[in-house]
Amino acid sequence: RQMCIRDSVYLVARMFPLFIGYAPEVLHWTAYVGAFTAFYAAVVACVQSDIKRVLAFSTISQIGFMLVALGVSTSADPHAGGLGYMASMFHLFTHAMFKALLFLGAGCIIHAVHSNEMSAMGGLRRYMPLTHLTFLVACLAIAGIWPLSGFFSKDEILTACFAFSPVMGWVMTAIAGLTAFYMFRLYYGIFWGAENRELHAAHKPHEAPLTMTLPLGFLACLL
């Protein structure tokens, strides 16, 4: 399903020479639709309690970022236009890494508490230190915090957006702020929120086995 979503970015990128040469208005609409998609999905992610739903809507929002970057490649500034295309492809790769880490981390968490709901979590940093650390790295990356890869790909996207239109630049900056909000809401709720002692007494949370945590460490090092 995740690959099918990313296919839209790949298709626009493959057709980019045709769009830029013969139908640049298509790229304009791609940018506008991408911005709306990024905003709508980010707002929905802010109110989800199922951790997999948060990550799913986050993926939709980040795909919107990539489409916006492709759409603003029609900027009058040739450098900024080329930057938009490159930033989109760069963000496609960085997003693949930190979102893979987030979903694998979510799998470890669900394995530990047998629930997708944040209400069944809270205080897991004491029981799952490695998952906690790697999940934090992924949250920092997707939020665009320096010096992780997400900072550089989002910075390039925002630079291209401001060159295209100051309004588009500020809109995407605000959406980047929303991304940081819902990801740290998720992180805090899982690892620092109020612990559900009744559920944890019935089934004590535990760190995932090495076969599950080793990929987390590997992906965290790539970010």
Model-derived features: where do they sit?
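Hydrophobic transmembrane alpha-helices and their helix-loop junctions in integral membrane proteins
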Residues: 2, 6-222
